[in-house]
Amino acid sequence: MREIEFTFKGLLIRLSLALSDLIFFNIALALAIVLINGFPGEILTGIPQHELDLKIATHILLSVICVGWFWVRLRHYTYRKPFWFELKEVFRTILIFSIVDLSVSALSKWELSRWIWILTWLLSMAMVPFGRACVKRLLNRKKLWKKQSIIIGSGKNAQEAWQALQSEEMMGFDVIAFYDVDGSQTALELFGVPVLKEEQQLWSLVDSDTQFIVAVEYEQSQSRDRWLKNLATHNCRSVSVIPSLRGVPLYGTDMAYIFSHEVMILRVSNNLAKHSSRFLKRTFDLVGALSIITLLLPALVILIFMVSRDGGAPIYGHERVGRDGRKFKCLKFRSMVVNSKEVLEEVLRTDPVARAEWDEDFKLKNDPRITRIGHFIRKTSLDELPQLWNVVRGEMSLVGPRPVIEAELERYAGDVDYYFMAKPGMTGLWQVSGRNDVSYETRVYFDSWYVKNWSLWNDIAILFKTIGVVLKRDGAY
């Protein structure tokens, strides 16, 4: 009976997601026609009825094929993928189908406005992911989306796997237990999740829908093999393996295996070493920076006036280390008093707590040097807007590692070479992952991860995340 129940649950989830995509694909067309040609009563003006009928029929057919592609080829309705990874696949697929639609329209010589085509597919890119997110939240409220999960392992790799899954809430993995494969874990709980010691305890929690995540340590390969066989003999259908690959570039990595051998070959991709990738990133930076400067020019003029009211220069440049170790002046709106250097020296000399905080992070949470307007522009990250000029000059990028002073390079230790491979960014993985609330070691890890796994899509994802972080003012001081 439970097998039937969970089979029905899985089918309901897949059909709900597929139906949502299909509906929003076609709502996008209807909305595009309304926006371009007016409201009902005016829609058919100047458009032959048979062409409109053919356009609608073609779009419905393409939407059905696209949903089939999502289901069968990309497995969006059967596999749970990270949000930004799935979104990239959705955008890429919709772009391909939009080109097919344009080709059909051109060959058919329809009189429909090309703006209908543009708006239809732009709306599809926005509405299909939005619809999916709504359906997943609705399923979650009905307790259908969450998938009971057990992590096989309790060491560092298993704990990092748990943290990664928690950061992707929309994947819906509800970890109910860790399983200690070799008895080495002394804690009874990790992150509030129980650590199981006995197999009997584990199997008592399992049903046919349970997701198993094998995340043992590198040196526990025998335990991994034993558990994969154990899960196979128990007919467990949902099994994932998270190998210990810390330090290995993951984005763009291809996997292959040698026939009849248990050997997996990972072909890693050093994207930032490619001239084409650097040209693409530079073009993206220039277009983005110049567009933002044009858009925010009135606000920049107002900020210059407000910051300079105390008699000091509104913009200052602080020396930072850039790509290949080249030094440059990193521009910012001045957020501190004019005699900030003397104030800092006095604070560090008289306050041992502040001295320790400065030595640890090169920052002070309650910095006495910051002015009233300085607090505001720091909280909102407006103090960093002059760095757009650094981007235009090619010294910085819109997205990249956090720009550091020379003294901080010692903290990067063996990862400093990764830092030198990329231009520092106005924003980056560190800024959207806690900013000042994370340890310096974690900052270094984020910078290294970004460089090893660079892609233009990751830059776009970080920029969108930055908007949310700035609005919520997370970790800013």
Curated annotation (Swiss-Prot):
Pathway the protein contributes to: Glycan metabolism; exopolysaccharide biosynthesis
EC class of the enzyme, as a word? transferase
Q: Where is the signal peptide?
A: none
Location comes to: Cell membrane
The EC code for this enzyme is: 2.-.-.-
Task: Say if the entry is tagged with keyword Transferase.
Answer: yes
**Record protein name field:** UDP-galactose-lipid carrier transferase
Native organism is Erwinia amylovora
